[in-house]
Amino acid sequence: MELVSRPPTGWLSALAAGAIVSAAIAWLAPAQLVVFGLTLLLVALTGFAAVPLLRRWKARQFIREDGPRSHLKKAGTPTMGGIFFIPWALVVPFAFAGWNPELIAAVALATSYGLVGWIDDFQIIRRQSNNGITPRQKMLLLIGAGVAFCLFHGLSGHGTATFGLGELGILFWPLALLALTGTANAVNITDGLDGLAGGTGAIAATVLGLIVIATHPALAVLCFALAGACLGFLVHNRHKATVFMGDTGSLAIGGALAAVAVLSGQLVALALVGGVFVVEALSVIAQVGYFKATKGPDGKGKRLLRMAPLHHHFELGGLHETQVVARFYLAGASLALLTWWLHTGWPPSA
């Protein structure tokens, strides 16, 4: 009898991501399990009420026609799911860490980025098309919020944060703004498959929280709450997704991760643990750049990938959506382990 290889289900990938995150927190920061578990539960339960409301409000996703054909069946799935999981991720930490100034700053940045995403999602829904605010408008809004955040950072005496690279001085500004806007957009780009941004975001947030917990405990609480919120969202966003997070969710996740990294001086760690986001963003940049560089008089150019971002390249190569997500989870977990090893030297050499 011939055995047929079947792709993993959405539940299987989501449970694997949850097991990785839960085990890491239980082992290395058991006191934070309450924050993580409470946020996960609140988001999961809220989703059962929020998703039908989004469907009733006709907050429907519009699928790009030039994307994979298999995604056309997702048209009409509710979007803007960030409105029910991001608030829990940003509110719960205050119950455990109090009104810490750094926590307030990080939450304010994530909230402002989520608001930019909400404006984009709202315009898409209102116009009944896949065109929200323009990329230029979105970038200007993200930069504006980033500048305000950096002003707080500088005025509070952290403007010379090292990021593990030595004192930066005036270079703090461009590097911090690049991290804030770049991470937000990278997570946004990654959010193209069911459960992809949520699972990889949870893994990245967990390890970043473990890294900063000794020196910035309030920011660590935010990270663990964000991880719980992302996994709670997977209850509804795993394949086959009943809701998408939209820019409301993805920009807020990226903003929160970057804000924690900037405030704690851990941008190198962010780049490593968020390597999946970095590669996804670079795949788009490389695809566009190569196409323009090889464009002939007829206006046609060559492509490095079958389709960008990278997850679509693998889809068009024959992998099922859940197989791509599972592999990206594995890559995210491997990068998380590498980041933790570089940070702590664990496991010790013989």
Swiss-Prot record:
Pfam families noted in UniProt: Glycos_transf_4 (PF00953), MraY_sig1 (PF10555)
GO biological process, one term: peptidoglycan biosynthetic process
Regions that span the bilayer: 11-31, 33-53, 79-99, 104-124, 139-159, 160-180, 195-214, 218-235, 242-264, 328-348
InterPro entries, per the entry: Glycosyl_transferase_4, PNAcMuramoyl-5peptid_Trfase, PNAcMuramoyl-5peptid_Trfase_CS
Keywords: Cell cycle, Cell division, Cell inner membrane, Cell membrane, Cell shape, Cell wall biogenesis/degradation, Magnesium, Membrane, Metal-binding, Peptidoglycan synthesis, Transferase, Transmembrane, Transmembrane helix
Cofactor field: Mg(2+)
Gene Ontology, cellular component aspect: plasma membrane
One MF annotation (Gene Ontology) recorded for this entry: phospho-N-acetylmuramoyl-pentapeptide-transferase activity
Chief subcellular location: membrane
Keyword NADP: no
Enzyme class: transferase
Entry EC number(s): 2.7.8.13
PANTHER family registered for this protein in UniProt: PHOSPHO-N-ACETYLMURAMOYL-PENTAPEPTIDE-TRANSFERASE, PHOSPHO-N-ACETYLMURAMOYL-PENTAPEPTIDE-TRANSFERASE HOMOLOG
NCBIfam families: mraY
Family assignment from sequence similarity: Belongs to the glycosyltransferase 4 family. MraY subfamily.
Protein task: Catalyzes the initial step of the lipid cycle reactions in the biosynthesis of the cell wall peptidoglycan: transfers peptidoglycan precursor phospho-MurNAc-pentapeptide from UDP-MurNAc-pentapeptide onto the lipid carrier undecaprenyl phosphate, yielding undecaprenyl-pyrophosphoryl-MurNAc-pentapeptide, known as lipid I.
Protein name as annotated: Phospho-N-acetylmuramoyl-pentapeptide-transferase
Organism name: Gloeobacter violaceus (strain ATCC 29082 / PCC 7421)
